[in-house]
Amino acid sequence: SGKILLNKERIDLINYLQEHVLSRDDIYFDETQIENYIAFSEKWYFPLDNWEKFIAPFIFLYFKEDDELFYEEFFITLGRGGGKNGFISTLSNYFISPLHGINNYDVSVVANSEDQAKVSFKEVFNTIDGNPKLEGSFDAWKAQIVGKGTNSVFKFQTSNAKTKDGGREGCVIYDETHEYEDRQIIDVFSGGLGKVANPREFFIGTNGFVRAGFYDKLEERSKAILSGENLNDRMFPFICKLDDPEEVKNEAMWEKANPAFEKPLSPRSKRLLNKVRKQYEALKNNPSGREAFMTKRMNLPEVDLEKVVAPWKDILATNREMPELQNRACIGA
């Protein structure tokens, strides 16, 4: 039928874009960049999913006045297996290519572990390595990939803020943002942005088990943007999740959390759906796995009430400023 199921946050995003972005007359889409990115990705990597083609134009949205980016930050969260890393692989390779055309536009992908940071890097490396046409435009080494025409470098980094200094990146991609307890590492890398034209940051991940961390703060920002409460915050929030835990019982609802399940299914999506279906069926004999399944596959953390003293929203409600204690007496026993 051509129809897709959307969760509330994506419906809100479409309404927000129609009301507050697409109605503006001081911005423009760079159609050449959009078409070049899609053509580059589909020639050397894979057909882009509809959700990737939906986001892509907003990556190349500019102000008419000075050709600066309208969106410099993107928050992309969906159920595990949806293709987030593939998307950032294509973007990273395109950004260092002559088609993008910005000299010294370095790209770093940052994650908590080296293995995760290397996921997209390896995909780009393997795509270039042994391909004579791509090897003519890129030097692929084990630690970095260089776009010859623009002298732009793509590399992976781990998120140990104590050992990092902000570089001169054009783009930083923060993977597995659900594991970040605070924004310390973001502050390190974002400090190097802006020295090169068109600075971009991508926050990628699926929900996790760290509460009140950086991921939750991104969700709070997204809510304020989509509600119209903070229209000055130009972050693009693309959030895919179930609206209600009960929806997990209806497999047709799963595409709310993972757009890879939109019809028609690609061969890769069919394999993924079969895997997720088996995991869901296994919960009948292993109910303790439900919390992880809901968090990672449905992108909707579900609290196990048997393990929790107080619900998280009740804990947050107790937050209050500490009183001034200086020069007050301290009594101990």
Whereabouts are the PLM-identified features?
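Phosphate/NTP-binding elements of NTP-utilizing enzymes
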Residues: S1-A333
